[in-house]
A protein has these predicted regions:
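ABC transporter nucleotide-binding domain
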Residues: 172-263
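Catalytic Walker B motif of ABC-type/P-loop ATPase nucleotide-binding domains
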Residues: 154-157
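Conserved ABC transporter NBD signature motif
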Residues: 56-64, 71-72
Length: 294
């Protein structure tokens, strides 16, 4: 489906993406994960034809994205990491506007929009102005807009950014539903645990390199296997759990009454820095230790 070979993106002497190779089969829900500046957004923008690579090839369904950009854009639905929503339009007008960009007839737009708004659970918001929607609703509307021309590949850059927990769950369920319908999906996030809950395959990026990619279970075991610690916390657990879950190199395995069991892909000094940061944020860490058998 999506094939990336020896992809580079240079800005002068700085390499934002370095020798990236990736294959995403049809029907996969693939997630790029990594810290800010890892190269996720740059890679996604190159896949979507929004910036040219310095070197390398991108093919979708065997079509070279660099040689046939117009054909490729018909195959891609893109949701950027900002809303790009016209707040002064009603939801129905917003869908009409984007449908017209693909030269769909009014009848086609109405039929497709009705189906898509039902899919993203916004059927009752058709005559509501976009600026009255919640952040989560706006994000789901962006997904509906990206699907209006029935693309074979849906690409989302940080789709859960800024969403509350309920909206994150709704987005996860929507993407999993789309995958069950046969869509191939590529998303990015800096939160590993988030991708682990929705993707069937992931790629870990760091400093422009794809350092690990494959089946979610295999990647998690390879990256985190054998690196397990327990963090003891006094008082409220939620801030500590949230902070650990948002770290790109940590997977929260379980949460007890006073202990958080995590897997990690960090050096000892990085663990110490993380614990110090937790304490600076007002979290009372009473200790941390390696689990037995590690």
């Amino acid at each position: 489906m999506l094939q990336i070979s020896h992809l580079y993106k240079n800005y002068g002497k700085f390499q934002a993406v370095r020798d990236l190779n990736l294959h995403v089969p049809k029907g996969d829900l693939f997630g790029f994960v990594g810290p800010n500046g890892a190269g996720k957004t740059t890679t996604i923008r190159m896949v979507c034809g929004l910036m040219p690579p310095t070197e390398g090839t991108i093919t979708i369904h065997g079509v070279d994205a660099l040689l046939h950009p117009k054909e490729i854009k018909k195959q891609i639905g893109y949701v950027p990491d900002f809303f790009g929503v016209y707040d002064n339009l009603k939801v129905s007008e917003y869908m009409d506007f984007y449908g017209s960009m693909y030269r769909m007839t009014s009848r086609e737009i109405t039929a497709v929009s009705n189906d898509l708004l039902e899919l993203v659970n916004l059927s009752d918001k058709k005559e509501v102005y976009v600026d009255t929607l919640s952040r989560g609703m706006k994000q789901r509307l962006c997904v509906a807009r990206a699907l209006i021309h029935n693309p074979s590949l849906l690409v989302l850059d940080e789709p859960n950014s800024g969403l509350d927990p309920r909206a994150r769950v709704e987005m996860k369920e929507l993407l999993q539903n789309l995958r069950s319908m046969g869509k191939t999906i590529v998303i990015s996030s800096h939160i590993l645990s988030e991708l682990a809950e929705m993707c069937n395959s992931i790629g870990i990026m760091d400093h422009g390199k794809l350092v690990e990619a494959g089946n979610i279970e295999d990647v998690m075991e390879h990256v985190f296997g054998g690196n397990r610690i327990v963090v003891s916390v006094h008082g409220e657990m939620e801030p500590a759990v949230r902070m650990l879950k948002e770290h790109p190199q940590i997977k929260v395995e379980s949460v007890g009454e006073k202990e958080i069991h995590i897997s990690h892909a960090m050096k000892e000094e990085e663990i110490a820095q993380l614990i110090a940061q937790m304490i600076q944020n007002g979290i009372i860490v009473t200790g941390f230790y390696k689990e037995e058998g590690n």
